[in-house]
């Protein structure tokens, strides 16, 4: 993972310039890392997703984008929507394991190294938990992997496999299902898919 104490927007701009990504987008893997929210790779539960492809009816069936999320940047709305959608029986989570979602430093609410960042995250967590009426938990569901894995992404897949196997072993030793939420999914309201 990224050592945030040694990272800045200036360093990021230098890394991007050196990576040569305009001629090969996959070169971004050479300067990337897993995000803090999904730091264990693709075989661990995700907190959120930066790309959701769903029908309008499906979004409506979970109440849409809840406008009570009134904190800067939308607060934890992304986590809320992902949790609600992933918990539905008709929802299938696909992961493009050879692709990435690259988030740059830009002064955003939760990614900026500011003194009050931790306090903001606590307020967002508290608001999310109150709307869910329970502590937030990443949905533990089986991901379906799609797509090719370019050579530049192989180390990420290797890390994901190793981390996923460690998780699987830990759950087996505890007699638990690593994808326990899969069997507890709830039907969508109003049809949806």
Where are these regions (language model features)?
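Conserved catalytic core of nucleotide-sugar-dependent glycosyltransferases
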Residues: 1-52, 60
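C-terminal catalytic/acceptor-binding lobe
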Residues: 68-181
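Intrinsic-disorder/low-complexity peptide segments enriched for small residues
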Residues: 14, 163-166, 186
């Amino acid at each position: 993972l990224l050592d945030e104490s040694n990272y800045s927007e200036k360093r990021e701009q230098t890394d991007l310039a050196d990576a040569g990504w305009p001629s090969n987008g996959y070169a971004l893997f050479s300067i990337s890392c897993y995000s803090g929210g999904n730091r264990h790779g693709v075989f661990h539960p995700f907190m959120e997703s930066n790309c959701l492809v769903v029908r309008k009816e499906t979004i409506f069936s979970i109440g849409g984008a809840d406008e009570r999320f009134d904190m800067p940047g939308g607060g934890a709305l992304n986590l809320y929507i992902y949790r609600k959608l992933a918990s539905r029986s008709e929802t299938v989570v696909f992961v493009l394991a050879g692709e990435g979602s690259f988030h740059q430093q830009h002064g955003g609410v939760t990614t900026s190294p500011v003194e009050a960042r931790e306090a903001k995250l606590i307020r967002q967590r508290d608001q999310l938990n109150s709307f869910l009426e329970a502590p937030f938990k990443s949905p533990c569901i089986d991901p379906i992997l799609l797509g090719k894995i370019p050579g530049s992404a192989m180390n990420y897949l290797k890390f994901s496999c190793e981390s996923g196997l460690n998780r699987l072993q830990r759950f087996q030793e505890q007699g638990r299902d690593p994808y326990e939420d899969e069997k507890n999914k709830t039907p969508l309201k109003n049809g949806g898919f």
